């Protein structure tokens, strides 16, 4: 398991190597919650996924990502919002062995 470094801003994109895979993760706040898009090798694999506490983001292996992503509330079980991203709400990369 690995924490992906994010900042408490309303919209951001990070590029990171996850299990040897080139990934870009976009995280953005809307009025209805925090959302995420995931690119694998510059190809969009999931878009507009509502980020929920301890719920996988990619969910299906057929998308090609080895492992998965999930936000975890460090202080309880609230749904993530951008003001706490990077401190209260951490984005984890879950390796295959973590699933």
Which functions belong to the PLM regions below?
Residues 79-99:
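Short, compact, well-ordered microdomains
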Residues 11, 31-33, 86:
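A general secondary-structure signal for short beta-strands and their flanking turns/coil
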Residues 1, 43, 76, 96-99:
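Compositionally biased, intrinsically disordered low-complexity segments enriched in polar/Pro/Gly
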Residues 31-75:
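Acidic, aromatic-enriched beta-alpha/helix-loop junctions
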Residues 1-26:
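Short, charged/polar N-terminal "headpieces" of proteins
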Residues 26, 72, 92:
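Residues in well-ordered beta-strands of folded domains
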Residues 10, 29, 95:
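A broadly conserved detector of short glycine/acidic/proline-rich loop/turn motifs that flank catalytic sites
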């Amino acid at each position: 398991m690995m924490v992906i470094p994010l900042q408490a801003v309303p919209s951001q994109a990070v590029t990171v190597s996850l299990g040897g895979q080139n990934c870009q993760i976009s995280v953005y706040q809307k009025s209805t919650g925090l959302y995420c898009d995931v690119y694998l090798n510059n190809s969009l694999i999931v878009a507009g996924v509502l980020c929920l506490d301890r719920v996988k983001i990619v969910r299906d292996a057929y998308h090609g990502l080895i492992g998965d992503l999930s936000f975890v509330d460090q202080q309880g079980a609230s749904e993530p919002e951008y003001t706490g991203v990077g401190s209260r709400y951490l984005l984890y990369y879950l390796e295959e062995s973590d699933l």
